[in-house]
Amino acid sequence: PFAQTEPQFLSDAVSLARQLRSLSYVELRELWGCSERLAAENARRVRTLAEDMAADTGALTAAVMAYDGIQYQHLRASVMDERQLSWLGEHLRIASGLYGLLRPFDGVVPYRLEMQAGLAVDGARNLYQYWGGRPYDALCSGRDVDTIVNLASVEYARAMLPQHARDAPPHALGTGPQVVTCLFGD
């Protein structure tokens, strides 16, 4: 599958990319908490990240193909037929520290930015404050959503789902969709 759409929060992602670019290599490595090799590779990416995001959507990677966590490995979008990909486009949303919330075929560039990273930007102390409730609002707006199946890690669910949605028992009545959280373990 190829990238077909622009991320909804692209201008916010560009702001984050510019903030990353303003950091020194030492600050970036500390923010990422990664090896020297990964830090060097990603520091090079950061220098052109904002500009790379502005590329023609068709030249970018579809979000569903860009990540390699266990959820994406088992999803196997690369072997889906057109009907399955269409369903995926309507129902799947991807939490991202850089892009906020992505649809499967939004065009993305390679980056490193975990949701729990302590990146201060635009008056927010961290990415949780920066994104606030916007990803959840986008997830639920314009569609008839009665259930969210949450495959995200705790760190990403914290950013994407309001506290009441994360903590409510499955049978609870209230505002917003029911959230079913899947736990992954060895």
Segments predicted by a language model, with ranges:
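Internal, well-folded beta-alpha domain core
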Residues: 77-186
